[in-house]
Amino acid sequence: MEASDTGTSALSDRATVRRHPERAAYDRATIDAILDEALVAHVGFVREGSPVVIPLSYGRSGDTLYLHGSNVSRTLGALASGADICFTVTLLDALVLARSTFHHSLNYRSVVVFGKGRLVTDPAEKERALECIVEHIVPGRTRDAREPNASELAATSVIALTIDEASAKSRNEPPVDLAADLTRATWAGVLPIVQHYGPPIADSFVSAGLEPAETIVSYERPRAVPRER
């Protein structure tokens, strides 16, 4: 993932966090760290008058997010048409267990990006974008795996989305209980969520003795420490 060119996302009305604004962040370091750790984005747009939200893998290069899919995909066609896009990612860090059901919550980190998609037509940018997406999923993987051939490139569409209207929002707190509930004989606190990757499982065509790369054996997502409140 390349560093962004700007230090702060542009503040717009729709990207401004109003509910718990103290949990918001607009600096690109925070936004980029969350984008670089997450694996799946939920991309919302309107297609033929109806709202649609699709989960997609992605990659980030500087100030640009890249999405890809089949060139016959209605989703990619809609994103390439200049439709307004809402791109979101969420990382769950803990379950927040309060003394009342009303005050149960989640500790999380999230990013919302607004913008319009751009169909990538330059062949060199398209190849870089596809490499960016693969490297986002498993850093170093493009050194081992075959590059896409001409027919695979022709069958794939790539959409670019500039990160120029975005916000991050996070919660990293214990339960917030009413004073009257603090004496209840009910356990309260946080239950941390840890994403774990198991040992690699080779498919049946892997040659005997061929071991996975160290980047696979010791695979972990980049992790930014949640902000303390």
Model region roles, listed by residue range:
Residues 11-66, 77:
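An N-terminal domain-cap segment
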Residues 64-66, 86, 160, 169:
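General beta-strand recognition
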